[in-house]
């Protein structure tokens, strides 16, 4: 019977003999660690599928991905439990504290100042070194300008002149224009084009039997201010007067009641007279007067020569006013006494008044009485009756 002998391939010969070296056996003590690491690496490579094992492929294609998933899952779980950051030591007493503590801020930020941000005349200041908040913003007082008007030849000219003056005044300014019976379309058009914040009111009183229409028109404005509790300085500015910008700038300095001298033309139109207070600084000590018929008045002031705080109308307790009835102008008094009768309801005497400007040394407005004739057209231009004439068309 023939025997078959299997010879070793030359590639498995020990290469140390070929080079002339002597063959040495493996020592267990020196290479045990290397042997263990090589076994772990071989097992890991087999598990991860780096080397292909035909026996493992026969067992099932799902085992190798399952073991791979299991190894990476355990590796990620161990890494997730490993603390990489620093943990602050919290005292046991603070663990269940419900107080909200401020975040830690470096000390160098505490001494830092924030610059002021200025916008026009308004400045805002944030926190300073001491931690105090300072606000330099002071809102300006509202100027409530009341102007009664009526239909006449120069009405549009007067209203536009007052409107152009008010446009140059610093805001806030509210222009209250009061008409009688009905608000005319022409007046509404003028007010819309002025560029001034306005309110167009109508006096519902019958003007035919009224002695002074301006009294009731101003009372309509006072009722409106009291109803809506407008907070500001009220000034009666007739449309036929001439005003300076310095006057409106000085009105915001009034705390309760302010007055100033008004220049006007005499009846002869050939000289100017002065009516108003005599002041020592801001204190009123006397009055200018030129008409003998008006010397019996308590206060010698023109209607456009004073202004007052609007809270007097709707908050009398603030000023300790003794009157329980509303503050209004009176139509029952003699002509020329409307001003003094109204002022007596606002203040008791000169000690509650303020002279504007200081020492009352400037003329801030003029009352000229330069009204045109009531007839809007010269004589002969208007015909009382229509001509009853018919012209046949050819």
Swiss-Prot record:
**Stretches assigned to the Cytoplasmic side:** 1-64
Instruction: Give the record's membrane topology.
Output: Single-pass type II membrane protein
Q: What is its EC number?
A: 2.4.2.-
Q: Where is this region: Disordered?
A: 1-31
Q: Which UniProt keywords apply?
A: Cell wall biogenesis/degradation, Glycoprotein, Glycosyltransferase, Golgi apparatus, Membrane, Signal-anchor, Transferase, Transmembrane, Transmembrane helix
Database matches in SUPFAM superfamilies: Nucleotide-diphospho-sugar transferases
Q: In which tissues is it expressed?
A: Expressed in developing interfascicular fibers and xylem cells in stems and developing secondary xylem in roots.
* Enzyme class of the recorded protein, top EC level: transferase
Q: What is the protein's name according to its record? A: Probable beta-1,4-xylosyltransferase IRX9H
According to its UniProt entry, this protein's organism is: Arabidopsis thaliana (Mouse-ear cress)
UniProt gene name: IRX9H
């Amino acid at each position: 019977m023939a025997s078959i002998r299997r010879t070793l391939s030359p590639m498995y010969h020990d290469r140390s003999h070929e080079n002339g070296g002597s063959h040495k056996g493996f020592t267990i003590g020196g290479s045990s660690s290397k042997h263990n690491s090589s076994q772990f690496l071989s097992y890991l490579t087999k598990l991860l599928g780096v080397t292909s094992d035909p026996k493992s492929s026969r067992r099932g294609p799902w085992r190798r991905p399952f073991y791979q998933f299991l190894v990476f899952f355990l590796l990620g779980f161990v890494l997730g439990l490993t603390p990489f950051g620093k943990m602050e030591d919290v005292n046991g007493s603070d663990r269940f504290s419900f107080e909200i503590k401020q975040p830690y801020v470096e000390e160098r930020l505490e001494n830092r100042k924030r610059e002021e941000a200025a916008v026009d005349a308004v400045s805002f200041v944030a926190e300073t070194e001491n931690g105090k908040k300072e606000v330099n913003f002071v809102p300006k007082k509202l100027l409530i300008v009341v102007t009664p008007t009526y239909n006449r030849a120069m009405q549009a000219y007067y209203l536009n002149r007052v409107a152009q003056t008010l446009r140059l005044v610093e805001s806030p300014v509210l222009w209250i224009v009061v008409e009688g019976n009905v608000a005319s379309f022409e007046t509404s058009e003028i007010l819309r084009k002025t560029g001034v914040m306005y309110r167009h009111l109508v006096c519902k009183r019958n003007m035919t039997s009224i002695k002074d229409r301006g009294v009731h028109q101003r009372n309509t404005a006072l009722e409106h201010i009291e109803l809506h509790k407008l907070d500001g300085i009220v000034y009666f500015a007739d449309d036929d007067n001439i005003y300076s910008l310095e006057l409106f700038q000085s009105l915001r300095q009034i705390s309760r009641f302010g007055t100033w001298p008004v220049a006007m033309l005499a009846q002869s139109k050939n000289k100017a007279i002065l009516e108003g207070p005599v002041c020592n600084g801001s204190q009123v000590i006397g009055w200018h007067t030129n008409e003998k018929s008006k010397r019996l008045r308590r206060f010698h002031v023109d209607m456009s020569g004073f202004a007052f705080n609007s809270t007097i109308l709707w908050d009398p307790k603030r000023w300790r006013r003794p009157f329980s009835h509303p503050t209004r102008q009176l139509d029952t008094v003699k002509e020329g006494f409307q001003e003094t009768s109204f002022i007596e309801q606002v203040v008791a005497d000169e000690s509650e008044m303020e002279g504007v400007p200081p020492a009352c040394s400037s003329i801030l407005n003029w009352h000229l009485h330069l009204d045109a004739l009531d007839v809007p057209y010269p004589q002969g231009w208007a015909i009382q009756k229509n001509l009853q004439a018919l012209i046949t068309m050819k």
